[in-house]
């Protein structure tokens, strides 16, 4: 089974958590695209979706799924999204696709965060995948200097502007042994919009695509 087939297995397995008549929180990325395809088979049975990115919105709308603005929805039953890395405590690095801030907002209003990944994303310690930080453009150099003080090696992701009009610094060389503490430290830097650590709001359910099919941990 290829990596993409494992992603597909995870994405389709998440469909069992979708309730008829509900509004579904939808993330961003290659694994989520498979979930969106699966969700399309229920387009007549759900109210719609809250999307974390322009890319996902376009894909959902193409399948006839109504999009709700985050401000129209008080809460969501579920939020389905992928991760770049996930540890045993279900803390994650996200934001490889530059949608981390909107992903964090949609995750915050969801009762249940369902993380869909392939088996390559599980790690003992977060940080091998560079940690994305969304930054207001005028603060880029200042934030980078502060990230160096925290032990990181920040790299400006050239040519990328987020859906919010900001820039991304990818922080290399961090072994993140206390994700919640680091999430707080980075979010406290003036000019940071948010960091791609999902530690305070980790996953409630992890669905991993494996060569044998989808493995669900609740």
Curated annotation (Swiss-Prot):
Query: What is catalysed by this protein?
Result: aldehydo-D-ribose 5-phosphate = D-ribulose 5-phosphate
Q: Recall the GO molecular function terms of this protein's record.
A: ribose-5-phosphate isomerase activity
Q: Does the keyword Isomerase apply?
A: yes
Q: Where does substrate bind?
A: 7, 28-31, 81-84, 94-97, 121
The Enzyme Commission number assigned here is 5.3.1.6
Q: Which UniProt keywords apply?
A: Isomerase
Biological process GO annotation list? D-ribose metabolic process; pentose-phosphate shunt, non-oxidative branch
GO cellular component terms given for this protein: cytosol
Q: Residues in the active site?
A: 103
Functional pathway: Carbohydrate degradation; pentose phosphate pathway; D-ribose 5-phosphate from D-ribulose 5-phosphate (non-oxidative stage): step 1/1
Entry's HAMAP family?
Rib_5P_isom_A
Q: What does this protein do?
A: Catalyzes the reversible conversion of ribose-5-phosphate to ribulose 5-phosphate.
Known partners and oligomeric status: Homodimer.
Q: Which PANTHER family match?
A: RIBOSE-5-PHOSPHATE ISOMERASE (PTHR11934:SF0)
Q: Which family does it belong to?
A: Belongs to the ribose 5-phosphate isomerase family.
Specify the protein name. Ribose-5-phosphate isomerase A
Species for this entry: Vibrio vulnificus (strain YJ016)
């Amino acid at each position: 089974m290829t990596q993409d087939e494992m992603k597909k297995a995870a994405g389709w397995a998440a469909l069992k958590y979708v309730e008829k008549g509900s509004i579904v929180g939808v993330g961003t990325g290659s694994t989520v695209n498979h979930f969106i395809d699966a969700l399309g088979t229920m387009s007549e049975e759900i109210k719609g979706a809250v999307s974390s990115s322009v890319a996902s919105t376009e894909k959902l709308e193409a399948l006839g799924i109504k999009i709700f603005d985050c401000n129209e929805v008080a809460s969501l039953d579920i939020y389905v999204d992928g991760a770049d890395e996930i540890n045993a405590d279900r803390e994650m690095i996200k934001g490889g696709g530059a949608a981390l801030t909107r992903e964090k907002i949609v995750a915050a209003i969801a009762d249940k965060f369902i993380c869909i990944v392939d088996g390559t994303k599980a790690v003992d310690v977060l940080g091998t995948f560079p940690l994305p930080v969304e930054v207001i453009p005028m603060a880029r150099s200042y934030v980078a200097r502060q990230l160096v003080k925290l032990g990181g090696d920040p790299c400006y992701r050239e040519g990328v502007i987020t859906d919010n009009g900001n820039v991304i610094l990818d922080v290399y060389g961090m072994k993140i042994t206390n994700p919640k503490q680091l999430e707080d430290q980075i979010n406290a830097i003036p000019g940071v919009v948010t960091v791609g650590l999902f530690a305070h709001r980790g996953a409630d359910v992890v669905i991993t695509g494996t060569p044998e099919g989808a493995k669900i941990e609740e």
